[in-house]
Design a protein with these regions (language model features):
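Sec-dependent N-terminal signal peptides of Gram-positive bacterial secreted proteins and lipoproteins
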Residues: 2-23
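Active-site-proximal alpha-helix that buttresses catalytic centers in soluble enzyme cores
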Residues: 26-298
Length: 298
């Protein structure tokens, strides 16, 4: 009888041991590498999915060895998303804190900003600097345009969204603008981009929604008149087609770009799609991320 009890006890111990092993296997060590795609954000569902989501998907696919995380920088957008739609998106500091707590050691941060402006520097670079001691490695990738060589690449990518243009037709691109941009060593980004489109022989006028920046809407109107366009296709030179695109660019208000251009007798055609859904633009961000991971950033 004692022998039977001993065998039963041994069997029970083996079952418990196997259960413990199974539990340990289920909790196998997680991946300690992550890629964080950080964007300004948007409350517009379509553009958040296709533009921001398009870049996120491309980057995540390029780094299958890294767990993907999303972060936004606009607190107003994050608050509205959570309050009105029940969508919770963390800012970059919170995302990095959670990654640290979860045991991640190698972090790649890919911003979806267009240039080294205030948003990129104050919301991304400054934040990452504060977390450099919390990970074995954390690197930040470049925005879309960094130096002179990027303009032709970016312009060619953006141009893939343009329709076939007829005689008297042109394209108007509305960028956001940045006070920091005016101090760039290589000159004003938007003016340089304009020169690039001109050299490519494309009928494009580039402007910024910020009136204090340049080229502003007045300069855009002057260019449309000087070039003699009868019809202009309007696109946001922004990752998302959000508030600026839907209201400032192509809204029905008297001071929208659409209204001001139509007052000149020029027909407008709106294309409310951000450049984030553009596969060629996505490819540029992926290239920057790959370079950052390899430690060959400019």
């Amino acid at each position: 009888m004692k022998k039977i009890f001993s065998l039963l006890a041994l069997a029970s111990m083996m079952v418990l041991a196997m259960g413990t092993m199974g539990a340990s296997a289920a909790k196998a060590p997680q991946n300690d590498k992550a890629v964080v795609v950080v964007s300004f954000g948007s409350t517009f569902d379509d553009t958040r999915t296709k533009d921001i989501g398009g870049i996120e998907e491309a980057v995540a696919k390029a780094f299958p060895n890294r767990d993907f995380k999303r972060a936004f920088t606009s607190y107003i957008i994050m608050e509205r998303l959570e309050k009105n739609k029940g969508i919770k998106v963390n800012d970059l500091p919170t995302t990095l804190k959670e990654l640290k707590k979860a045991g991640y050691k190698d972090i790649l941060v890919q911003p979806t900003h267009l240039l080294h402006g205030e948003e990129y520097e104050q919301k991304v670079l400054t934040t990452v600097d504060k977390f450099k001691g919390d990970f074995d490695r954390i690197v930040v990738s470049d925005p879309l345009m960094v130096g002179k060589n990027d303009f032709a690449i970016a312009a060619s990518a953006v141009a893939t969204q343009f329709p076939t243009l007829g005689k008297g037709e042109g394209v108007v691109l509305m960028g956001h603008g940045s006070p920091r941009d005016n101090n760039q060593s290589f000159g004003n980004t938007y003016k340089m981009l304009q020169e690039t489109f001109d050299k490519m022989g494309l009928p494009v006028v580039v402007g910024t929604v910020e009136e204090v920046d340049t080229p502003n809407v007045d300069e855009v109107l002057e260019q449309i008149k000087a070039r003699g366009y009868k019809t202009v296709h309007m696109f946001p030179l922004m990752i998302v087609a959000g508030d600026h695109a839907n209201n400032d660019m192509y809204g029905d208000e008297e001071d929208s770009w659409k209204s001001l251009i139509e007052k000149m007798g020029v027909k407008t055609i709106g294309h409310l799609q951000g450049i984030g859904r553009n596969a060629a633009v996505q490819a540029i961000y992926v290239q920057h991320a790959v370079a950052a991971e390899a430690g060959v950033q400019r």
